[in-house]
From Swiss-Prot:
The keyword Mitochondrion does not apply. The lineage of its organism: Viruses, Riboviria, Pararnavirae, Artverviricota, Revtraviricetes. Residues 68-117 are annotated as: Mitochondrial targeting sequence. The gene is X. This is Protein X. GO terms for biological process: DNA-templated transcription; symbiont-mediated activation of host NF-kappaB cascade; symbiont-mediated arrest of host cell cycle during G2/M transition; viral genome replication. It comes from Hepatitis B virus genotype A2 subtype adw2 (strain Rutter 1979). Pfam families: X (PF00739).
């Protein structure tokens, strides 16, 4: 069973942040309140970042107060359909990097929740893992191959 998390975009960094859903929130729908983001800092990963908890190979920044800055997608089928085949996300991120009108932060957040994150959480597939980084991530991923930075906008 995959860890229950919710995601939120930090528009100041163009970074998708994941937050573990607390035990008291278990079972609530992902469309509920998302809370607020902490202000990012260069040393966002504390010494005790919780990597020992082993939540499906999340990046070590997953437990920082600023939230993780990389997401290890485990739904290769969904990513092939929505991203690789139609090239939706790379085009959107490229436009945002250039400062051109593109998908709004709210729409992009909904895209991850509805098209990607739901399958990742429910299916828990760990075959043909891919890493998609929005805004760049300086943290190593736990038990993951070298990240595919083709979405990096930094």
């Amino acid at each position: 069973m995959a860890a229950r998390l919710y995601c939120q975009l930090d528009p100041s960094r163009d970074v998708l942040c994941l937050r573990p859903v607390g035990a008291e929130s278990r079972g609530r729908p992902l469309s509920g309140p998302l809370g607020t983001l902490s202000s990012p800092s260069p040393s966002a990963v504390p010494a005790d970042h919780g990597a020992h908890l082993s939540l499906r190979g999340l990046p070590v920044c997953a437990f920082s107060s600023a939230g993780p800055c990389a997401l290890r997608f485990t739904s290769a089928r969904c990513m092939e359909t929505t991203v690789n085949a139609h090239q939706i996300l790379p085009k959107v991120l490229h436009k945002r990097t250039l400062g051109l009108p593109a998908m709004s932060t709210t729409d992009l957040e909904a895209y991850f929740k509805d098209c990607v994150f739901k399958d990742w959480e429910e299916l828990g597939e760990e075959i043909r893992l891919k890493v998609f980084v929005l805004g760049g991530c300086r943290h190593k991923l736990v038990c993951a191959p070298a990240p595919c930075n083709f979405f990096t906008s930094a």
